[in-house]
Design a protein with these regions (language model features):
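Conserved alpha/beta-domain cores
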Residues: 1-105, 109-111, 123
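C-terminal helical cap(s) of enzyme catalytic domains, especially alpha/beta-barrels
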Residues: 109-129
Length: 129
């Protein structure tokens, strides 16, 4: 929520309403960031109170399993949160469900994603220097 507040402050300073996606840590992995699903209501209310923030949807990542089918329940829960989020905002405002990366985007799409992040599939693995 502190990040939302900072974005709101900076957007307000330049007279902008910033579109954002709320990131949820559905899998509960310690290596992932994001809002825990049990903090959903608190996060939604905090976002709605910020005048320079426009929530457009949510994003989440599944753990990397050896068996891709194990990602399906995570993406399914992401879709459920997305539908719940849609009910909290004006009709049409929540329109992005970003789930799935280069290795698991097919299952994410099957489970309702309408935005995927496939940079590695397009550009290759990152080279860290």
């Amino acid at each position: 929520i502190s990040i939302l507040q900072e974005i709101d402050k900076r957007a307000g300073q330049i007279g902008k309403v910033q579109d954002v996606l709320l990131e949820f840590n559905i899998s509960g992995e310690e290596t992932k960031t994001g809002i825990e699903p049990d903090a959903f209501e608190e996060a939604v209310e905090a976002a709605k109170a910020l005048p320079n923030i426009r929530v457009c949807g949510l994003m989440c990542m599944a753990p990397q399993f050896g068996d891709l089918e194990k990602t399906r329940p995570v993406f399914r829960e992401g879709h459920e949160l997305y539908k719940k989020l849609q009910k909290k905002f004006p009709e049409g405002q929540i329109h992005i469900l970003s789930m799935g990366m280069s290795h698991d985007f097919e299952i994410a799409i099957e489970e309702g994603a309408n935005m995927v992040r496939i940079g590695t599939a397009i550009f290759g693995a990152r080279v860290y220097r």
